[in-house]
Amino acid sequence: MSKKLVAYFSASGVTAKVAETLAEAIGADIFEIEPKVPYTEVDLNWMDKKARSTIEMNDPASRPEIAVKRDNMKDYDTIFVGFPIWWYVAPSIINTFLESYDLTGKTIIPFATSGGSDIGKTNERLAPSCKGAKLLDGKVFKHSVGHKELAAWVDGLKL
């Protein structure tokens, strides 16, 4: 049995709830991807062209710093990476996270939360950050998803 990690970034707590439920459902360790400079409500105002999140998402080279790295990443074979959908893709802090480790031989599985957006071009944007890893297709979940649905999704991946 491979060792699994659920790593997630959550701006509002919704993705954190789904990540915790997923980790419990599949018996995985959990790790929160925290920005070195926390996002404020003003930073997250997607309607403001000068908001931090808007500026980051409009710059493909943007890599927001992460507060803490996971020390034992080498111990994991499978990494579920969770995040809210921003502008139809993963927030750029997810690229920062993925690029911070040697992912050679690991399986990366994105999962996202959104009130209405689909996964969009997430994998296309994440693939360059997953060098040497197998990147599986991601899935979007509503905040109300339960253990049973998450466990069934993971079973269907045939890891």
Regions found by a protein language model. Give the residues of each.
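A structural micro-motif
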Residues: I26-A28, K106, A133-K134
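Short, glycine-/small-residue-rich phosphate/pyrophosphate-handling segment
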Residues: I109-V145
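Glycine-rich, N-terminal phosphate-binding loop of Rossmann-like dinucleotide-binding domains
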Residues: F83-P84
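N-terminal beta1-alpha1-beta2 submodule of the flavodoxin-like/Rossmannoid cofactor-binding fold
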Residues: M1-T78, Y88-A90, N95-E99, K148-L159
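Short, conserved loop/helix-junction motifs that constitute active-site signature segments
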Residues: M73, E99-G105, S129-C130
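Acidic catalytic loop of the alpha/beta-hydrolase fold
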Residues: W87-Y88, G116
